[in-house]
């Protein structure tokens, strides 16, 4: 069984600056990538920017600059977001890069050689904002797409992809791969759409210039979504079989928002099948963040700047909130009050205060060392309910991540911290110092060990803060994987701890 794990975000469209929706997608994908690294997987994590299409060309014209200069600047906004959010992507693909253009040309030729592309004439509804074609039945009386985007009637020569031919093959694929689209509500949505009947898809445009030209026919620009979807393999070195392409494809998980589900769950696997390439193993679809109940979107002008939030609250605090506040796949409403409550109630009170109390007590009362207790006593400590809970959560969290139940993992970690707060209150080591010194050492060791579990499990979510916690506890850098959450890697009795510092200050 391959020990590799390939995860992608959608590549972000560069017609405006990044917002909290992009931050959420990126952090969720980053948490999964970091989690898999903590499981010992060889991870490839890709993100990037989608830089072609009519919408980008119009945005550049409106700013009176050429499209390449426009995309250079706006793509950098997304790179800056990745740095600000502490995103651990292994690569950042831009669709204006030569490596991508070459891969798209090869992919197009493969489709052409396999008889999946033919020339014709397109007449129908098109949304520039969505960069998507819509059927007459999907358009409202006000000439709006289902997304609320305006549409225009387009008439132009076009190349077509024979999508209708793949209807039965797609339905068979969904049947054989029940986890291809998750959650199940989105899977049902996709199956319903495909069963309603697929029509061949226009995959080139002639009414604008900013895009990858069709090989041997430069009057046509390749449809931006066909171009964009190929990024997931172009970044791996497709079609070179000696590259990361053969190592990592098919992707284990592709994370997308519900607004681009059709492109990823219908068009993308059909394109790949036609090119004789395996589809990704799973597509995980998340919901939208809302602001006063309205989708947060650059098109609607109600965005929340994640950089501003980071500057005010801290990167790990914002990351934690985004992952804790919502069930992955559902919509969530952003409020500052909820953000502050999560930070103060959970990060500061339940985890930060616990760490500071225990490390301070050990630092001041045990010569800054992990209590020197015997191996047999550590065995006894591992029989305590609180350590059994810690070990149970460590195993359970891996199963939860398989189902992408991210908020439940955090719930387990918070519950463990709450158990530790109850344990310290009940055992009162400050009293034991006077009455039973050996028992005090056992209690302190137990609490330090529980904190080791909490910190290691927190790493994918709040990486900087979790590593500071582990530094304070004296946990070696090479002993911070999930496989170390066992008795054999318990804190070494007598090892040094660092001077305590506040990691999660109260807001």
Swiss-Prot record:
Please classify the protein's predominant subcellular localization into one broad category: cytoplasm
Report a single Gene Ontology molecular function: ATP binding
UniProt KW ATP-binding keyword: yes
- Biological process terms in GO annotation: methionyl-tRNA aminoacylation
Q: Which parts of the sequence form the motif 'HIGH' region? A: 12-22
Location of this chain's protein in the cell = Cytoplasm
User: Which Pfam family is one of those matched by this entry?
Assistant: tRNA-synt_1g
| Catalysis: reaction(s) | tRNA(Met) + L-methionine + ATP = L-methionyl-tRNA(Met) + AMP + diphosphate
The function of this protein is: Is required not only for elongation of protein synthesis but also for the initiation of all mRNA translation through initiator tRNA(fMet) aminoacylation.
Q: How does it assemble?
A: Monomer.
Could you say which protein family the record assigns here? Belongs to the class-I aminoacyl-tRNA synthetase family. MetG type 2B subfamily.
Record protein name field: Methionine--tRNA ligase
The organism is Rickettsia typhi (strain ATCC VR-144 / Wilmington)
């Amino acid at each position: 069984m391959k020990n590799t794990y390939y995860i992608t975000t959608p590549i972000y469209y560069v017609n405006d600056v990044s917002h909290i929706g992009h931050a959420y997608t990126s952090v969720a994908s980053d948490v999964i990538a970091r989690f898999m690294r903590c499981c010992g997987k060889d991870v490839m994590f890709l993100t990037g920017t989608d830089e072609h299409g009519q919408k980008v060309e119009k945005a550049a014209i409106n700013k009176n600059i050429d499209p390449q200069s426009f995309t250079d600047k706006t793509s950098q906004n997304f790179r800056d977001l990745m740095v600000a959010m502490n995103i651990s992507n292994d690569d950042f693909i831009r669709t204006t890069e030569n490596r991508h253009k070459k891969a798209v040309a090869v992919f197009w030729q493969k489709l052409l050689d396999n008889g999946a592309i033919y020339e014709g004439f397109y007449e129908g509804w098109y949304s520039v904002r969505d960069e998507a074609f819509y059927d007459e039945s999907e358009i409202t009386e006000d000439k709006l797409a289902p997304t609320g985007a305006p549409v225009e009637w387009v008439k132009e020569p076009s190349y077509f992809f024979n999508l209708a031919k793949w209807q039965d093959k797609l339905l068979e694929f969904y049947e054989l791969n029940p986890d291809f689209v998750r959650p199940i509500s989105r899977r049902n949505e996709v199956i319903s759409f495909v069963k309603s009947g697929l029509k061949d898809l226009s995959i080139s445009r002639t009414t604008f210039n900013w895009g990858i030209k069709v090989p041997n026919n430069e009057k046509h620009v390749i449809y931006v979504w066909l171009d964009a979807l190929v990024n997931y393999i172009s970044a791996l070195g497709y079609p070179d079989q000696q590259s990361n392409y053969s190592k990592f494809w098919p992707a284990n998980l592709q994370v997308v928002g519900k607004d681009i589900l059709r492109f990823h769950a219908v068009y993308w696997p059909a394109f790949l099948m036609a090119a004789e390439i395996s589809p990704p193993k799973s597509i995980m679809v998340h919901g939208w963040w809302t602001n006063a109940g309205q989708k947060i979107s650059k098109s609607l002008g109600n965005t929340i700047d994640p950089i501003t939030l980071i500057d005010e609250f801290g990167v790990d605090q914002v990351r934690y909130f985004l992952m804790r506040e919502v069930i992955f796949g559902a919509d969530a409403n952003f409020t500052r009050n909820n953000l502050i409550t999560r930070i103060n109630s959970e990060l500061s009170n339940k985890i930060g205060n616990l760490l500071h109390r225990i490390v301070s007590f050990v630092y001041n009362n045990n010569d800054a060392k992990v209590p020197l207790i015997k191996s047999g006593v550590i065995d006894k400590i591992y029989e305590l309910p609180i350590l059994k809970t810690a070990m149970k959560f460590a195993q359970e969290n891996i199963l939860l991540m398989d189902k992408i139940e991210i908020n439940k993992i955090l719930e387990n970690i918070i519950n463990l911290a709450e158990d530790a707060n109850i344990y310290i209150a009940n055992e009162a080591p400050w009293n034991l110092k006077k009455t039973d010194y050996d028992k005090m050492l056992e209690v302190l060791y137990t609490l330090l060990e529980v904190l080791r579990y909490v910190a290691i499990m927190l790493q994918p979510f709040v990486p900087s803060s979790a590593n500071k916690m582990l530094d304070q506890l004296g946990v070696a850098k090479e002993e911070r994987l999930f496989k170390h959450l066992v008795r054999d890697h318990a804190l070494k009795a007598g090892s040094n701890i660092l001077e305590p510092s506040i990691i999660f200050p109260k807001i």
